[in-house]
From Swiss-Prot:
HAMAP family: Rel_fac_2. GO terms for molecular function: translation release factor activity, codon specific. Belongs to the prokaryotic/mitochondrial release factor family. Methylated by PrmC. Methylation increases the termination efficiency of RF2. One of its GO terms (cellular component) is cytoplasm. The lineage of its organism: Bacteria, Bacillati, Bacillota, Bacilli, Lactobacillales. This is Peptide chain release factor 2. Disulfide bonds: none annotated. PROSITE patterns: RF_PROK_I (PS00745). Peptide chain release factor 2 directs the termination of translation in response to the peptide chain termination codons UGA and UAA. SUPFAM superfamilies: Release factor (SSF75620). It is found in: Cytoplasm.
Length: 364
């Protein structure tokens, strides 16, 4: 590595560190660490063991973030000092290159930590697929997305479970709800929230014309026991029905499927996967809690935007990505401009490039 390459690396590292500093409120981080440390000294801190463990984990993660940033800053300062010496003594080059390699390794790891550091990023995820108008073509597109997300989840080692499945009239799906259980499931899948557009020659059109279909995807974090969402029993209407598997297999002779309607908001959720009515009601309640929590967060975000004067489209109601099968092949994310030509790989669950681009776009 010649000196000009070393200078370029140091300049790039300087920019990346500045980006990290811009995304971190160091004073706020110090204050948050102090608050949690004081909280852990309270006499009744360990009375609620689950909450205490969560607080302890949160404190450790914040401390790690703070310490790692300062370690990277120290490494960068050392590399600049060694660069000054390099002009007079080339024997320091090996040490300088080792410092740069160590710094770049730390920055790569740190960047991923920052990308997945928002609230609930480490939670499990609930993902819903709702085809738009367009009949069989749109419902088949929904089924293609179901396959894509299932393959993505399996490749990541997540436990993927179908919570509710409504088959299409001729092919595909009318709607489906999935759960993804594993580290950072929500943090990775939140990039998929929005409307997905398909352009292809429809296999259901005898004239072989090109069709455009739309399907909306909604993603919510599964809430743990430390987050309480109060739901009054009087506000819930419960309906039961006979449920079956995908395509109508294993139709139950008893009404085990559960549909819950939250009367004040009109939100409807249902679960059919469990063999018992009790199990499906429990799953449906978790889905309802997640939806109500998300609704409250969206209201707060809308209030902040109105105070700022921002005019933004509702994220889950806007087109986020196009999948073009003809006259050329391309998948393009309209938020980040990230695109690939290998549409088959994407449909097989290779979403890492899109997720990485989205997380970096949010960070910046």
């Amino acid at each position: 590595m010649d000196i000009s390459e070393i200078r370029q690396k140091i300049d790039a590292n300087r920019e990346k560190l500045a980006s990290f500093r811009g995304s971190l409120d160091l004073e706020g981080l110090e204050e948050e660490i102090a608050i949690l440390e004081n909280k852990m000294t309270e006499p009744d801190f360990w009375d609620d063991n689950i909450a205490a463990q969560k607080t302890s984990q949160e404190l450790n993660e914040l401390k790690q973030t703070y310490e790692n940033f300062h370690q990277m800053t120290d490494l960068f300062d050392e590399s600049e000092i060694l660069l000054d010496f390099l002009a007079e003594d080339d024997s320091v080059q090996e040490e300088l290159e080792e410092k740069l390699a160590e710094l770049e390794k730390m920055m790569t790891s740190y960047e991923m930590t920052l990308l997945l550091s928002e609230p609930y990023d480490n939670n499990n995820a609930i993902l819903e697929i709702h085809p738009g108008s367009g009949g069989t073509e749109a419902q088949d597109w929904g089924d293609m997305l179901l396959r894509m997300y299932t393959r993505f989840g399996n490749a990541k080692g997540f436990k993927v479970e179908v919570l509710d499945y409504q088959a299409g009239d001729e092919a595909g799906i009318k709607s489906v709800t999935l759960s993804f259980e594993g580290p950072h499931a929500y943090g990775l899948l939140k990039s998929e929230m929005g409307v997905h557009r398909l352009v292809r020659i429809s296999p259901f059109d005898s004239a072989k014309r090109r069709h455009t279909s739309f399907t909306s995807v909604e993603v919510m974090p599964e809430l743990d026991d430390t987050i309480e969402v109060e739901i009054r029993e009087d506000d819930i209407k419960m309906d039961t029905f006979r449920s079956g598997g995908a395509g109508g297999q294993n139709v139950n002779k008893v009404s085990t499927g559960v549909r819950l309607t939250h009367i004040p908001t009109g939100i409807v959720v249902q679960s059919t996967v469990d063999r018992t009515q009790y199990g499906n009601r429990d799953r449906a309640m978790k889905m309802l809690q997640a939806k109500l929590y998300q609704l409250e967060q969206e209201k707060k975000a809308a209030e902040v935007d109105s105070l700022k004067g921002d005019k933004k489209e509702i994220s889950w109601g806007s087109q986020i990505r196009s999948y073009v099968f003809t006259p050329y092949t391309m998948v393009k994310d309209h938020r980040t401009s990230y695109e690939v030509a290998q549409v088959d790989k994407v449909m097989d669950g290779d979403l890492d490039g899109f997720i990485d681009a989205y997380l970096k776009w949010r960070l910046n």
